[in-house]
Amino acid sequence: MPRAVFLVLLVLSLGDTKAQLTIDATLTPAQLVQNVFQGPGVTIQNVQYQYMPADSIVPELGAFSAESIPGLPYGGIVLTTGALADIIQPADSFASSEHLQGIDSDTDISWVMYGFGTSTGVPDFSILEFDFVPDEGILEFAYALASEEYPEYACGYPDGFGFFLSGPGISGAYPYTDNADNLAVLPGTLLSVNVSNINGGDPDDMANCPPNNEQYYLDNADNPWMVFDGLTTLLTVSREVTPGVQYHMRLELADAGDPYWDSALFFQVNSFRSVAASTAVNDVPDNGTSWIRCSTDHAVQLLGIKDACVLRLSDMHGREVLRRRVDPGQRSIQLPELASGIYVAMRMGKEDNACARIFIP
């Protein structure tokens, strides 16, 4: 029997019956993870929020529904360093709530934001964790980061987060707890995603704080529905896993330097899932056709592409390995020498985007 999606929303709005953002603050961490975030192909258990029982109601974690807010998923769960009630107000307001859980620091998230070996305190953070067993070989989920640090403090207060995956066969690039791998990295790099690594610069001090990876940044200063002044585009995590094996996932978000300028992570509904690693391309509708196929001579064939676009190829750790312009009518692109494995291809055009998984033998 298909699992029902549990997303009953308590409306917290500005009084307009056509609110663009609603939040449900009445669900437990277990309900949020297992009934809202969980998608097909995974079994989740042992949900815990910051050392609290899974049946607790916490003011930093809830479900949300969003309509026509650029960058945000259309619905899912939200994890914040402040209070959920502060999120739904105009962007020219201010979200500043000290954390209620009384935890002073965490080594892994401190290292993500400030560098390994540092002892800088993290005064305000949220941790959501759980065990899961994937049915298939690729773990995926989608998210966006929003913050009050944007834009004025983008270069000075790197509010950030980590998605720490641990379990059999996992060996991270850095010495995180339990040898975990941090999946929250910029495409094509090992740099963690945070406010300082993705921003549009400080408009009052561009000389000292220029834009950084601004292709992933969205300004939100004029939004009447959500308080955060900026956010990232919708980003996707993808990681190879072993089917049938239990893993541990720790989703952690923190303020940097002070507890007053809040940030939040918005996770797309039902996006935490596992999918098969296939030698065939997943069909992605493009006027009824599949748009990309892999050849055996280190090339990809492009089908049905009528307008100019950019082709981006990433490995299953989210690291970008290729970015090329595609001209109208172009039929193929030669690939560099890449290791055998599964890659994610994204077509980024003026009118639309599309994704597919391809296997390079």
Please identify what each model-predicted range represents.
Residues 1-25, 279-281, 355:
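Bacterial Sec-dependent N-terminal signal peptides
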Residues 20-278:
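Aromatic (Trp/Tyr/Phe) and Gly/Pro-enriched flexible surface segments
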Residues 162-164, 310-314:
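Beta-strand signatures of extracellular beta-sandwich domains
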Residues 236-238, 331-336:
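Exposed aromatic-hydrophobic patches
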Residues 244-246, 308, 338-342:
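Extracellular Ig-like/FN3 beta-sandwich strand-entry sites
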Residues 273-297, 304-305, 309:
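Residue-level detector of functionally pivotal "anchor" positions at catalytic/ligand-binding pockets or at interdomain
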Residues 301, 323, 328, 336, ...:
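C-terminal tail/sorting-segment detector
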Residues 313-321, 343:
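Short, glycine-anchored, charge-dense loop/turn motifs used at functional sites
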